[in-house]
Amino acid sequence: GAHVFLEKPIAESVEEAKEIVDLARKNNLKLVIGYILRVHPSWMKFIEVAQDLGKPLVMRMNLNQQSSGKNWETHKCLMNSMSPIVDCGVHYVDVMCQMTRSKPVRVSAIGARLSEELNEGMYNYGKLQVSFEDGAVGWYEAGWGPMMSEVAFFVKDVVGPKGCVSIAGMKDGEETDDVDAHSKAESIKLHHAELNDNGEFAKQDEIIDCADEPDHDGLCYREQEVFLNAITNDVDLSDHMDDAVNSLRIVLAADEAFKTGKTVDL
């Protein structure tokens, strides 16, 4: 057998995902899944700050991509097997699970087919809603194609009892289908909900600068460092593999919810 670095999602079904993880465990081999946001310093900080906002959390995220030419062709190829909320959603659902540290219990979804160039039954816009055991809720929206709007296409925002934190992402003029821009964080804004005796805000908003961050290739290099370290130092990847299965379970439940029009209990 061989140690494996596997791009996300880990499989096209939960059963296949479990089979892959069980195989890695049985043969004592390392399996790292390409959750690139887990090695992104700005996103790691975003998760850390969100965990200090109290419970429950409200998590609002999206990544819509207005694509054309080769990028639209790539999107159509990806949609031969899975919708945008499945392909991209695993990243952001994984982030939500890290923020809440709670068990997801319910998933619902809406979606729309906005192009006749897609296979029958496929849709290129979707939005999932997930509820957690601790009362946290989150939504993730993803749409691909030449028709997609670039208004409010990069929302990364978390609200808790103690305040809210958000990522200020792409600059004006950047293309939404630019892979380098998808994980970019220009800065993180932290707002405190605490009020003083006059009923006014007790603290000013904080801006955490994220300008000095790796590009997409740099993040891919970090992923390979994680993989190499796991092999050379025999790192236990149990949680990493279980998280990959769980995030896939949520987005596939969202896909089912859209197709059936019913909320799915996990």
Regions found by a protein language model. Name each.
Residues 1-2, 72-80, 203-209:
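Short glycine/proline- and charge-enriched loop/turn segments
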Residues 16, 21, 26, 177, ...:
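C-terminal helix-rich "cap/oligomerization" subdomain common to oxidoreductases
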Residues 1-38:
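Beta-strand-loop-alpha-helix segment that lines the small-molecule cofactor/substrate pocket
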Residues 37-120, 126, 261:
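Predominantly a Rossmann-like dinucleotide-binding segment in NAD(P)-dependent oxidoreductases
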